[in-house]
From Swiss-Prot:
It comes from Arabidopsis thaliana. Residues 57-66 have a biased composition (Polar residues). It is found in: Nucleus. A motif (Nuclear localization signal) lies at residues 160-167. Pfam families: RNase_P-MRP_p29. Residues 36-56 have a biased composition (Basic and acidic residues). This is Ribonuclease MRP protein subunit POP4. Belongs to the eukaryotic/archaeal RNase P protein component 1 family. It comes from the Eukaryota.
Length: 296
């Protein structure tokens, strides 16, 4: 008896659960149908509204030609046709202007460059590359800026002053002024020059004083001085002595007693000159590129 009641209760519970599931499924189905009906109603209402609007547009009366009011351009009350001022009217493009289609125009040049440049033309057509036009007007009376004009003027003045006082080394070599012919490379020919140099130096020392002898020698003209090469980076020139007859920015030209012309570099060289009772040692590095090497 007890087992029958248990089975009966389980069957009743199962039926109740199935009824609940069925009720939930019916509710979901009803909700979906309602949503679908609302969408259908909304679609039909939109179609009706569009149909009404098109019908109203067709039913509107078209304006007749007689109803359009013509505006007189001479009427002062019309703002759209107010006359322009005289300066503005002159600057407007004239209606009778004809554009030239002849060759050589800017348009033809641009097209020619585009078609000739190959890949660049394709890039230009695609908009990835822009074409820059350099349209310059060359003036007959070109006026330089103040800075460039003043700079060129100063340079020309400087060159003119230098050309008056001295010649460049390049011009000296080209003109042959630095070349001493072999028939003039005689020690005896330059002995009078040595005597003139001694008198010149003695007068110079009297004017400047013995205390400033070193400064005097640095600025003095040494052409005609009897010079002895005590040290030189070229071993064959060490011990050379004679009269100095030519000076450049980097060398001393010496005529020896055996009538030979030697060009001794100043750099890393030591020279000794005899002046009256003094023996003066000169370092060649101090005499490189002197401002007053030779006054010509």
């Amino acid at each position: 008896m007890g087992t029958e009641t248990v089975v009966h209760d389980q069957a009743r519970w199962a039926m109740a659960a199935m009824e609940r599931r069925l009720a939930v499924a019916k509710a979901q189905l009803l909700q979906q149908q309602q949503q679908k009906n609302e969408k259908d109603k909304k679609g039909t209402s939109d179609v009706d509204v569009s149909m009404k609007e098109s019908h109203q547009a067709d039913s509107l009366p078209t304006p007749s030609k007689t109803s359009i009011k013509k505006v007189d351009p001479k009427d002062d009350d019309s703002v759209a046709y107010t006359k322009l001022s005289h300066p503005v009217d002159e600057n407007l493009l004239a209606t009778n202007v004809k554009f030239s289609s002849a060759k050589g125009t800017i348009v033809d040049k641009v097209l020619h460059n585009l078609l000739r440049s190959g890949d660049s033309a394709q890039k230009y057509l695609q908009g990835t590359k822009s074409v820059k036009l350099d349209n310059y007007i060359l003036l007959d009376n070109f006026v330089q800026s103040r800075s460039s004009a003043s700079g060129s003027k100063k340079a020309s003045q400087k060159d003119s002053k230098r050309s008056k006082s001295r010649m460049s080394m390049k011009r000296l070599k080209k003109s042959g002024a630095l070349h001493i012919p072999k028939d003039l490379q005689k020690f005896d020919l330059f002995k009078p020059m040595h005597g003139m140099w001694e008198s010149y130096m003695m007068k110079l020392i009297k004017v400047t004083g013995k205390i400033q002898l070193s400064l005097t020698l640095l600025s003095a003209d040494l052409h005609g001085a009897f010079m002895f090469v005590a040290e030189c980076k070229i071993a064959s020139f060490t011990g050379v002595q004679g009269i100095m007859v030519r000076e450049t920015s980097e060398t001393f030209g010496i005529i020896t007693r055996d009538d030979k012309f030697r060009v001794v570099p100043k750099k890393l060289s030591v020279f000794i000159i005899q002046l009256d009772c003094w023996k003066i040692t000169l370092h060649g590095d101090k005499f490189i590129s002197r401002d007053n090497i030779v006054q010509r």
